Design a protein with these regions (language model features):
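N-terminal secretory signal peptides that target proteins for export/translocation
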Residues: 1-2
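Short, charged, low-hydrophobicity "junction" segments
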Residues: 6, 49-56, 164-171
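Bacterial N-terminal signal peptides
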Residues: 6-16
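Active-site-adjacent structural segments surrounding the nucleophilic cysteine of cysteine proteases
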Residues: 21-148
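Conserved active-site-adjacent core of cysteine acyl-enzyme catalytic domains
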Residues: 102-210, 216-259
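Short beta-strand-to-coil "C-cap" segments at the C-terminal boundary of structured domains/repeats
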Residues: 263-266
Length: 266
């Protein structure tokens, strides 16, 4: 094999082995309906006229960005958990972001860590470990594989382990676009109920692999949902047409399709 051929093969293998959760994926995204940035005039107008946006102010108040490319699931979980149970006196205190030197001048009786869920402390309640989220091989269907991030069903289990009542929907061919639209709109019109979606970025016209984020609102005039993307480094909040969103969820992830999780508090 020539030197040029060996270099080409090495580059090909390097691309193939990049985990989906971290891949930037510069390949052309599939052709889909246009995504409208939330920060645009049109994006703000859609929120203003929406009649399915009661979740938005609560989620926006609790919003945080993921700290790494595999934590979109835990970050979405933390945002929703704080929206549901924020200011409860029994919330966990995450000390992982405080270093010993940070505490040297703080009175010993005072705990500076705020009582709230974080993308770090929500993981420990679920079956999937932090190491597995970050690529430690795990057994799935009898095979040892790396499974970065969270599949929809794994995230649903973690949310339940943290005390939420959920309903998982896997978006396969049996689930119609109209049924999905109706369920999501009904949830977004009820206070205290939330939606987390799992979708493939490439399928919705963005660069990247699988991703998870909450939904914030629905605009009937444009038939689009507001995706509160937890990775602003890759993409900001966008209005995503229903057909595009369904296309992104109706994609395969390891053992089954992606989908959405309805968090029910009533």
């Amino acid at each position: 094999m020539s030197l040029i051929a060996r270099i080409a093969l090495a580059l090909l293998l390097a691309v193939v082995q990049v985990p989906a959760a971290f891949a930037l994926d510069d390949a052309p995204a599939s052709v889909v309906q246009e995504l409208v940035p939330f920060s645009s005039d049109e994006g703000l107008a859609r929120l203003a006229r929406s009649d399915a946006k009661v979740d938005f102010p609560v989620l926006a108040n609790q919003f945080e960005a993921e700290s790494n490319g595999a934590f979109c699931g835990p970050t979405s979980a933390a945002i929703v958990l704080n929206a549901v149970r924020g200011r409860s006196p029994d919330l966990p205190r995450d000390h992982s972001r405080l270093h010993p030197e940070d505490l040297q001048y703080i009175p010993s009786a005072y705990d500076p860590a705020l009582p709230r869920f974080t993308q770090d402390n929500v993981i420990s309640k679920g079956q999937k470990t932090r190491a597995q989220v970050l690529g430690e091989p795990m057994t799935i269907n009898g095979k040892k594989i790396q499974d970065f991030g969270y599949q929809a069903r794994q995230l649903d289990e973690m949310l339940r382990a943290n005390g939420l009542t959920t309903r998982l929907t896997i978006v396969d061919d049996s689930k119609s676009e109209q049924d999905i639209r109706t369920e999501l709109i009904e949830n977004l019109k009820r206070r205290g109920d939330y939606v987390i979606i799992s979708y493939l970025r490439k399928a919705v016209g963005q660069q990247g692999g699988g991703h998870i984020s909450p939904l914030g609102a629905y605009d009937a005039l444009s038939d689009s949902f507001l995706v509160l993307d937890v990775n602003p480094t890759s993409a900001g909040w966008v209005w995503m047409p229903t057909a595009t969103l369904v296309k992104g969820m109706r994609t395969f992830d390891t053992v089954e399709n992606r989908g959405y999780i309805l968090i029910e508090t009533h």
